[in-house]
């Protein structure tokens, strides 16, 4: 049987994880900041889900801040993060910087509405899922059906997050669609651009 899994295409980049066990990142957790700075994979998703649950248990009323600089990756791993964000009580504010591509884009726009931020020189990429095709004809058909189902689910959620129609999302994610920070704001992926330290600093400190 073919071991094929649907993914969102990953943009080329450094394969070295962004220091998930580094003391600096652990220190950020004390301020309720989670750093997502690598390809979305199962081990990374498990870590972020655990951090979300831990911070929610520590204070269910205080916002959690998810910083995203990611080329995308596994849909199933990304959806585990998404589902955890929806299940916990605290609002999850998202801050995109650098590149938010594929699943990185989806998680950025999945933050609590009104609390989705993007730095002024960040870039956002939206496109549809893809998967490796191999194995028997039945395997190929099953994998294709899985990809189409995931495309529908993610497109429906993205339409809800951005205020666009499903038809508009299907049109715009058919091929690689890059957005500047301003274009991402206009499209509805985020609610505000980060132009000064106070843009998000006051929100983090004033909860």
From Swiss-Prot:
Which controlled-vocabulary keywords does the entry list?
Cytoplasm, Hydrolase, Protease, Serine protease
Subcellular location as annotated: Cytoplasm
Provide the reaction this enzyme catalyses: Hydrolysis of proteins to small peptides in the presence of ATP and magnesium. alpha-casein is the usual test substrate. In the absence of ATP, only oligopeptides shorter than five residues are hydrolyzed (such as succinyl-Leu-Tyr-|-NHMec, and Leu-Tyr-Leu-|-Tyr-Trp, in which cleavage of the -Tyr-|-Leu- and -Tyr-|-Trp bonds also occurs)
A GO cellular component entry from the record: endopeptidase Clp complex
Provide the top EC class: hydrolase
Q: Which Pfam families match?
A: CLP_protease
Lineage top rank: taxon = Bacteria
Q: Which GO terms describe its biological process?
A: protein quality control for misfolded or incompletely synthesized proteins
MF GO annotations: ATP-dependent peptidase activity; ATPase binding; serine-type endopeptidase activity
CDD domains reported for this sequence: S14_ClpP_2
- Which proteins does it associate with, and in what oligomeric form? Fourteen ClpP subunits assemble into 2 heptameric rings which stack back to back to give a disk-like structure with a central cavity, resembling the structure of eukaryotic proteasomes.
State its role.
Cleaves peptides in various proteins in a process that requires ATP hydrolysis. Has a chymotrypsin-like activity. Plays a major role in the degradation of misfolded proteins.
> Which protein is depicted?
ATP-dependent Clp protease proteolytic subunit 2
């Amino acid at each position: 049987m073919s071991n094929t899994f649907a993914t969102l295409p990953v943009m080329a980049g450094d394969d070295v994880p962004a220091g998930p066990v580094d003391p600096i990142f652990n220190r950020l957790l004390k301020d309720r900041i989670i750093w997502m700075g690598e390809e979305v994979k199962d081990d990374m998703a498990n870590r972020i889900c655990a951090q979300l649950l831990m911070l929610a248990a520590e204070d269910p009323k205080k916002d959690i801040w998810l910083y995203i600089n990611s080329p995308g990756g596994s849909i199933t791993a990304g959806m585990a993060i998404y589902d955890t964000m929806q299940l916990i009580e605290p609002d999850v504010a998202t801050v995109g910087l650098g590149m938010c591509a594929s699943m990185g884009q989806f998680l950025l726009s999945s933050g609590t509405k009104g609390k989705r931020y993007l730095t002024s020189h960040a870039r956002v990429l939206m496109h549809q899922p893809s998967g490796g095709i191999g194995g028997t004809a039945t395997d190929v058909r099953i994998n294709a059906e899985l990809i189409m189902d995931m495309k529908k689910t993610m497109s429906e959620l993205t339409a809800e997050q951005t205020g666009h129609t499903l038809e508009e999302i299907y049109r715009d994610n058919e091929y690689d669609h890059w957005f500047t920070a301003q274009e991402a704001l206009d499209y509805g992926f985020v609610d505000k651009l980060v132009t000064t330290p106070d843009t998000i600093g006051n929100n983090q400190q004033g909860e």
